[in-house]
């Protein structure tokens, strides 16, 4: 009996061509954000702590301006719309698992992905500065302070009959890639999959992703 494909797809740098949090910080944040970014990359700060501190540098009044900026500048990776159509046609569950924030992830995926299939961090604009909330924080098996914990989400959403495929690009996708049955990877994640000998294939566009999925024998 063939297994059911279940897809877990990253957002920043995977669905979009660039990292949207970095784009926001470069455009709107004071210089202090750079040190926070470096501390995250050096693992001196958890992603949850670092991203929370970065957004706390931004006034809540900037919300609409930030969304307008991203909607006018961010680009979806080539073939993404066709990829979404392919998953719907084949009845393949597709979950977006993102370290991004709801106030920009939802508008950018509006009309493509239902909100209940998007798992990302939340936001609170009721105070002077933006506050990030963490509805998908680490479960009892993860202590990494992920923010939006992708390994926890895979454990929660996995199916007994599932063949779980992770699609991603960066360090924040590595832990969940290690749990997956198969990985479609680019950039940093591709190098790590090669180093760790994880079952994987490279992709550049989402047309490549569809080609790889069609070749996987688990497709009914």
Curated annotation (Swiss-Prot):
GO MF annotation: an example: 2-hydroxy-3-keto-5-methylthiopentenyl-1-phosphate phosphatase activity
Keyword Transit peptide carried by entry: no
Enzyme class, first EC level, given as a word: hydrolase
Annotated InterPro entries: HAD-like_hydrolase_phosphatase, HAD-like_sf, HAD-SF_hydro_IB_MtnX, HAD_hydro_PyrdxlP_Pase-like, HAD_sf
GO biological process: L-methionine salvage from methylthioadenosine
Keywords for this protein: Amino-acid biosynthesis, Hydrolase, Methionine biosynthesis
Record bears the keyword Amino-acid biosynthesis: yes
E.C. designation(s): 3.1.3.87
Superkingdom of origin organism: Bacteria
Catalyzed reactions per annotation: 2-hydroxy-5-methylsulfanyl-3-oxopent-1-enyl phosphate + H2O = 1,2-dihydroxy-5-(methylsulfanyl)pent-1-en-3-one + phosphate
Pathway: Amino-acid biosynthesis; L-methionine biosynthesis via salvage pathway; L-methionine from S-methyl-5-thio-alpha-D-ribose 1-phosphate: step 4/6
PANTHER family: PHOSPHORIC MONOESTER HYDROLASE, UPF0655 PROTEIN YCR015C
HAMAP family: Salvage_MtnX (MF_01680)
Function of the molecule: Dephosphorylates 2-hydroxy-3-keto-5-methylthiopentenyl-1-phosphate (HK-MTPenyl-1-P) yielding 1,2-dihydroxy-3-keto-5-methylthiopentene (DHK-MTPene).
Classification via NCBIfam families: DKMTPPase-SF, HAD-SF-IB, PRK09552.1, salvage_mtnX
Family that this chain belongs to: Belongs to the HAD-like hydrolase superfamily. MtnX family.
Record's protein name: 2-hydroxy-3-keto-5-methylthiopentenyl-1-phosphate phosphatase
């Amino acid at each position: 009996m063939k297994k059911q494909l279940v897809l877990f797809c990253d957002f920043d740098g995977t669905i979009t061509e660039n990292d949207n949090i970095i784009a926001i910080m470069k455009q709107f944040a004071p210089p202090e954000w750079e040190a926070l970014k470096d501390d995250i990359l050096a693992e001196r700060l958890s992603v949850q702590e670092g991203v929370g501190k970065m957004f706390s540098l931004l006034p809540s009044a900037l919300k609409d301006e930030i969304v307008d900026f991203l909607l006018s500048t961010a680009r979806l990776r080539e073939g993404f719309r066709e990829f979404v159509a392919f998953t719907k046609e084949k009845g393949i569950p597709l979950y977006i698992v993102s370290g991004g924030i709801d106030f920009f992830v939802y508008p950018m995926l509006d009309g493509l992905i239902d909100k209940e299939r998007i798992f990302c961090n939340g936001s609170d604009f009721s105070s002077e500065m933006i506050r990030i909330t963490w509805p998908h924080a680490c479960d009892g098996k993860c202590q990494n302070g992920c923010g939006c914990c992708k390994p926890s989400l895979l454990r929660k959403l996995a199916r007994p009959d599932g063949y779980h495929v992770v699609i991603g690009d960066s360090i924040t996708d590595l832990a969940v890639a290690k749990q997956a049955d198969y990985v479609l990877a680019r950039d940093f994640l591709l190098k790590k999959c090669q180093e760790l000998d994880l079952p994987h294939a490279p992709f550049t566009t989402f047309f490549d992703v569809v080609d790889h999925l069609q070749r996987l024998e688990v497709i009914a």
